[in-house]
Amino acid sequence: MKLIWKYLMKYKKWFLLDFISVFGFALVELGIPTIISDMIDYGIETQDTTYLYSRFGIMAFISVIGVSGVVLLGYCCSKISTNITRDIRNDVFEHAQAFSAAEMEKFGVSSMITRTNNDAYQIMLFLNVILKSALLTPVMMCVSVMLILKISLELSYVVLATIPVVILGVIIVAKVSEPLSENQQKSIDHINQILRENITGIRVIRSFNKQEYEKKRFSNENDFYRDQSAKLFKLMSCTEPSFFFLMNIATVIVYYLSCTLLNSNAVTLGNVVAFVEYLFHVMMSVLIFCMVFMMYPRANVSAKRIMEVLDTKPSIVNDENSIQLDSIQTLSFKDVTFSYPNGEEAVLKNIDFSCHKGQKIAVIGSTGSGKSTLVKLMNRFYDVSRGSIEINGVDIRKYDLESLRSQIGYVAQKAHMFKGSIQSNICFGKPEASVEEMVHAATVAQASDFISTREHGYEDEIAEDGTNISGGQKQRLSIARVILKKPSLYIYDDSFSALDFKTDAILRKALKPEVKNAIFFVVAQRISTIMDSDMIIVLDEGQIIGMGTHVQLLKDCSVYQEIAHSQLTQKELDDYERN
């Protein structure tokens, strides 16, 4: 397995120590049957107590070395396996951080969680076993077979005939178990997906009375996982008894043949005892080998799933000669067309406009017109399919991604909160911010009032995904987070939708001095939110069908007129024109 070998090479010293401890333990264990054989032949049968006492001392010394070897072996194995699992999880997480939205959609959140946790854990279990047995098993088996051949060639035929039967059985079991293991891991993905959907969408499920449907969906997937696991466990549970049955038959045959050999003085009683001990070591080595071989399919499936993530190259990457972006003075869309990965039709078509520092730009249009998609392209969450987006006259693909995003403050349509304090959420983009800066940002975002009513104020805890605060409070905290960052380009993607009209108006007024030296980009549904914009872009089916000020669009754009008249009275529109 390339994945395991790649990470194993990082711990060469520990692996070498593991190697040494394996050899030490194996040689000690394999020496004991020979000593017992000599004790029987030269001590017990001759009643030489002095010889027996001397061999007892040697056995005690060897046993201490053997125990020390086992302890050292266990420590090395746990050290290597846990560290490698940690490294795999870190690498998967770090690699996923560079994924664009397209790669994240390809794998899915639930599958990524399963790969990072469950699949990495399966590899740890496999590593822990293989590091103990991969070196120990061949040494024990090879040396035991050599000693068996040395003791009696006739008896060794029993062992040599048994081993191929066991190995053949293991190969068959491994082939049968691999597809079952793969189905298991995929089923865990689906179970996690259903769980996640039910936890995050519990209100929708209840409002549509779909609890029974969701229970059945989860139960069906859970039953499938149970069935696959049961088949796997049954397969494994049959393998071990079969092995011991075969081992017992071999032992009985050895004892039967030994009677004839003892009568002809071909072997001694000590030889027979040692032979049976070595036979046990051979069989146990084969058993351990079987266990590793049976664990391999599941670990291999997990390794493939992890490699699938690590081998996926992010589609959004830095240019080889990327440049730093210090501030944004101008922003231009030049004949931009965009289609989502695997999408049949373009979501945006021939988008063309320019704006500069100090301007407020608004985007409005019907649902599905491409408003949110347009602003996502500015952050390079996706790259354009055709055309270019330029900042300060340079294609944004030429800029270093980190420096580009450091100049953009983006408030998503759905506000996201992290588990932690209100302070940590506001300061997420600027952890070093002073208390005064944080309070100012919260005040501008109209969040300070509700924060002051909380028991611990800014230190009050927010639950995972902000489940203990309202939608409007989430939006205000998200807005405060961006205000504190002080970017060159503010992007508010329908971020005022959960606010009442009064709070919306106060917030927009408070925002003006904050954004006067930046480009202020707003996606909105409300005409009242964007009436004072320097330029309003009207989108319909991914195309610009109108562009200008509020007054200009009321005269020239029929779609804008429809939206305006559906939200405002003629008197309100006339009053705005007069002012």
PLM region descriptions:
Residues 1-29, 36, 44-58, 65, ...:
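Membrane-integrated ABC transporters
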Residues 10, 14-27, 38, 59-68, ...:
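Transmembrane helices of ABC transporter permease
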Residues 25, 29, 33, 61, ...:
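Alpha-helical transmembrane segments
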Residues 46, 82, 90-114, 118-120, ...:
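Short intracellular "coupling" helices and adjacent cytoplasmic loop segments at the cytosolic face
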Residues 47-48, 143, 147-164, 170, ...:
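Helix-loop-helix
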Residues 325-579:
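ABC-type nucleotide-binding domain
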